[in-house]
C-alpha cells in the first residue's frame, strides 16, 4: 500500500506591510536603486550569524541630524568588530544625506525619516561552498513611527526591572553598535508582560544600569544630571547632545555608574535616543518618579533640543501621529 501524505495547507496571507512610496530609493554598495529592488542573500553572515554593524540617524525637515557624530560611532563599531567596509565613510554619509533628501521630498508634508546604515561581513562561507564574500553596506530610510511615542512627551513612559542582563564585555564591548539584540527582545517581552507599554531597564551582571533596548538612561538628582560612564552603556549620540544642551543651559552634569535604586530614588529619569530625542520616564516598577509627571529639567532640555532642531519636536510628533491615525 502506498504511503499516504498529509495534504499541504495553503499558507495564510501575509499581514499587510507598509509599501515603499513611489520613487523611494535605497543605496547598496555604492549605487542608488529602487527600494523594492533592495535585497540581501539569506546566506549573508549578517543573517546567519547576526554579524551586522549598524547606525541609525533621523532627519529634521529632511536633513540628517548630527551626522558627523554618527559617522564617528559607525567608524568605531566597524573597527571593534573588524569589518572593513571598503569605502570611505565620508562617501557613505554623503550618499546618506542625498538619500534622505530625495526620499523626504516625496513624503507627506511635515514628516521626517529614520535612516539606517548597516554593514555585514558578506557571504558566510559555510553556506557558499566555502567561499567568503566581500562586506555589504546598505542605506535605507523609513517614516518615523511618531505614533509610538507622541504621547510620551507629555505623559512619560514606564520602566521595569527585568531578569535579562546586558551582554558581558567578554563577548563584545558595549560600545559596538550591532544588530545582535536578542537580549533586548527578551528584556522588553518580560517588561511588557509585567506592565503594558513598559520598557525594560537592562543591567550588567553586577547590577550596574546599562540602558533600555532603544535609549540611553540618565537621572536627575538634586538638580544634577547623572549618566552612566562609557564602560556601562553605548555612547549615545543623543546622550552627548543632551549633555551639550545641559551645559548651554547651565545645568550640572556628572558621570557615574547607576543602580536600579538610583532610578527609584531619582527626581527625574531621562531617556535619550535618535528617533524621539528625549523622553521622560515617569514610573519605575509601578511607582511614580518624582512628581509622577515630566520634570522641569526634562522640559528645559526638550525646549533646547527643539531650538537646535529648528522645530517643535513634541508638536511634530503629535501632528504626524494624528495624521497617521486618520489615514489608517
Predicted regions, residues:
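Glycine- and Gly-Pro-enriched alpha-helical subdomains that act as flexible
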Residues: 200-201, 208-230, 235
